[in-house]
Amino acid sequence: MASEIFGTAAIFWVLIPIGLVGGALLLKLEGD
């Protein structure tokens, strides 16, 4: 069970920064 919680946390730690960076890049591209 602990491994499942760790895996889920790891997924969020990876996806959240990617989402933030991806969103920022999209806004930058639309701005240009």
From Swiss-Prot:
Keyword Membrane: yes
Topology of this chain in the membrane: Single-pass membrane protein
The protein, known as: Cytochrome b6-f complex subunit 7
GO molecular function, one term: electron transfer activity
Coiled-coil region(s): none
Pfam family name, one: PetM
Any single GO BP term: photosynthesis
Compartment list: Cellular thylakoid membrane
